[in-house]
Amino acid sequence: MKRLLFTLATCCVMCACEQKTEMNPFFTEFQTEYGAPDFTKIRLEHYEPAFLKGIEEQNAEIKAIVDNPEEPTFENTIVALDKSGGILARVSGVFFALTEADTNDSLTALNEKMAPVLSEHSDNIYLNQDLYKRVADVHQQEKEGKITLTTEQHRLLDKYYKAFVRSGAGLDAGKQSRLREINKELSTLGIAFDNHILNENNAYQLVIENEADLAGLPEWVKAGAAEEAKAAGKEGKWLQSLAFFAIC
């Protein structure tokens, strides 16, 4: 009897874990027209697990590229690198679009939390010496005429090679360590700066008491300013913020 109960409990836990995985919409391709995000299924609690799983997935994909015993080629190095990070790309595309256009306190807090984590992940890729050597090898192959690439393939190779060089892949270990510290600090300060600007923009109010000062403005702009003033408890006046009016 005890064995049966243990088995049932184990099955329940496994099913719950599987259900939890299936419930996160970022873990699989969006099953929508054109692959657009299905915002009816996306919730705040989905983002952080998706970021972490995306990092884990891409780390494994990068390791597979580096551990490949075959000589570096465009397909097994550049294409493989370009295709890595599917989950991370999906969650990043949605998350950062929202933090730029429709953020809130919860998204802002998560953005601050994930910034140094994502910065470290990026450095782990572009400062990975074994991966850089493979990319540089393919770049050298094309430079010496050993391989012929299409215009699109050349562009992709050039993009990644320059990304590694410009990210510090050629620096010595000491300078790379310092670069990691700088990148981590910049990721945090950059978000703090953006938040300060957003807060100042949201707080700004220009209250207009004399309608003559609105001369020349379209009626729909005046109406919008009057509505904003009313909502702010300043009925009978006009309020101009830094938000955009919807054009009807």
Per-range role (PLM):
Residues M1-E22:
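Bacterial Sec-dependent N-terminal signal peptides
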Residues C17-C248:
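Zn2+-dependent metallopeptidase catalytic domains
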